[in-house]
């Protein structure tokens, strides 16, 4: 009998675009990518949907239904079953997704070793984009390109890397490439 590791990860995404359905899709994709980055296949998810408190309960309900539909469609596309969740209204909309996955061999970001190569499987720079958006800058074309890239699946790349025996993997998001690389190297007192 082959032992399978269970992996869990949780991630949250604020509304970077004005389409609650698309935010639901992106939130699920963002969460499963953390599981992929550990060499696992996602299986189940719990969701938390915070819709923006509106003057109209009808608008809140509509945003919730759209976000839930985006989460469900993305979960189906990635082979994930949503097994529960919660919803609420806040001053700022947000979706959080906890994903569980399974793998024969989990790969973590603390396994980097001297002599390892750095592979980057997608574009970088989203941290700068998010910081600009948080500061009130309008960057329409860049956000559209980010959405297109964010929807691409990295499942095959992560599975191949795990099979090939890589020592460490991570999903480059919140801390940017430099931040994640620094974190990965610090575990074993490595440098570039």
How would you name each of these model-derived features?
Residues 1-192:
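Helix-biased detector of long, well-ordered alpha-helical tracts
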